[in-house]
């Protein structure tokens, strides 16, 4: 029994939130729902909680979701959902993991402090915020705002249609899902001459 091996540990449960708690403009999966975690709509979450409570007096909650807008309202809705779960099952919470998907240093967008303060205000009436740990997973929000990808040209070929410029870096390094439509970039060139059509290709 795996839970016996971890009975001395701080066990966390991944919650599968009902997508209906979010605004449709914020979440892509309103109709299909999320794939990870235990759902409170079909008693799976209740069963998971009961199993954990046989071995531990406290429990952690994981509440990740994917947002297309990175809106602060997404995390407010998620925190309110967590509060309802905590109240419903009378949970003694050791930590709460709100996942990632935050903006990172983008001018005019929600700051890290604003996210955290909004989340804190929801949890403060229900948990001891001095003892209950809050985890966030900013990931790309950290690295995306402080890292530049620097590439150089390694090959140039003239074809019938265009000049093909190959670099030693690739789009996959900064946009592995190939979703982004435009990029902030700067050029360092030896000449200011503007050639006819050029296509910049990543290294593959």
What are these regions (language model features)?
Residues 87-92, 126-130, 158-161:
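Secondary-structure transition/capping motifs at alpha-helix termini
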Residues 82-86, 116-127:
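Alpha-helix-loop-beta-strand connector modules within alpha/beta enzyme cores
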Residues 71-77, 105-116, 144-155:
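Short glycine/threonine-rich loop-to-helix capping motif typified by GTGT followed
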Residues 118, 133-204:
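Charged (often Lys/Glu-rich) extended helix/loop segments that serve as interaction or gating elements
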Residues 13, 61, 98, 137, ...:
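Conserved, mostly hydrophobic/aromatic
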Residues 1-95:
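Active-site-proximal beta-alpha core segment in soluble small-molecule metabolic enzymes
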Residues 9, 130-132:
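A short helix->loop->beta-strand "cap" motif at the edges of active sites that frequently abuts
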Residues 64-66, 96-106, 136-141:
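Glycine-rich beta-strand-to-loop/alpha-helix junction loops that act as flexible
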């Amino acid at each position: 029994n795996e839970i016996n091996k971890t009975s001395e540990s701080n066990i966390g449960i991944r919650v599968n939130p009902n997508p209906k708690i979010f605004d449709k403009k914020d979440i892509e999966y309103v109709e299909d729902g999320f794939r990870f975690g235990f759902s409170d709509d079909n008693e799976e979450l209740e069963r998971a909680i009961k199993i954990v409570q046989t071995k531990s007096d406290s429990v952690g909650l994981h509440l990740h979701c994917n947002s297309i807008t990175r809106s602060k309202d997404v995390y407010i809705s998620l925190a309110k959902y967590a509060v309802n779960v905590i109240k419903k099952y009378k949970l003694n919470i050791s930590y709460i993991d709100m996942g990632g998907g935050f903006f990172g240093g983008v001018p005019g967008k929600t700051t890290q402090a604003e996210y955290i303060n909004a989340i804190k205000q929801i949890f403060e009436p229900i948990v001891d915020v001095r003892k209950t740990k809050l985890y966030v997973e900013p990931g790309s929000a950290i690295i995306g705002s402080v890292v530049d990808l620097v590439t150089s040209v390694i090959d140039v070929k003239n074809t019938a249609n265009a000049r093909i410029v190959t670099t030693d870096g690739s789009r996959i390094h900064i946009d592995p899902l190939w979703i982004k439509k435009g990029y902030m970039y700067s050029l360092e060139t030896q000449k200011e001459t503007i050639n006819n059509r050029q296509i910049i290709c990543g290294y593959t």
